[in-house]
Amino acid sequence: MNIKGLHTQEKPVSATSLFKSELGNATAIQILQGGKLKEHITKTPALLICVEGEVVFENENGLKEKLLPGDYVNIEPMVKHWVVGTIESQLILIK
């Protein structure tokens, strides 16, 4: 199995459940070049990991991080944030 195979449509942003449990879940996210995961908040702490590609993560507190394969960012609860794909990218979000 490969994470790329989880996204069958060429949408700018695609998300699909990778793993669910009572204690948390993991979501596979694909962002195409120029695609943007719109501004939103999370109610719980989260971890975003870049598996492939390059994205820019930003939040309303002024944090701006370029994520390359192997890079990650901790996402604070109740803080608006968004992600833009510099090139086609594969990410994993753990909550």
Question: Where do the language-model regions lie?
Answer:
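Ligand-binding loop in jelly-roll beta-barrel domains
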Residues: 77-95
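Histidine-centered metal-chelating micro-motifs
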Residues: 36-37, 72-73, 78-82
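Glycine- and acidic-residue-biased ligand/ion/polar-headgroup-sensing regions
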Residues: 44-55
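A short, N-terminal "cap"/entry segment at the start of jelly-roll beta-barrel domains
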Residues: 1-27
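A cytosolic small-molecule/anion-sensing beta-strand core signal
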Residues: 51-52, 68-69, 87, 95
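Conserved short histidine dyad/triad with adjacent acidic residue
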Residues: 12, 25-42
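Short acidic-glycine-tyrosine-enriched beta hairpin
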Residues: 61-77
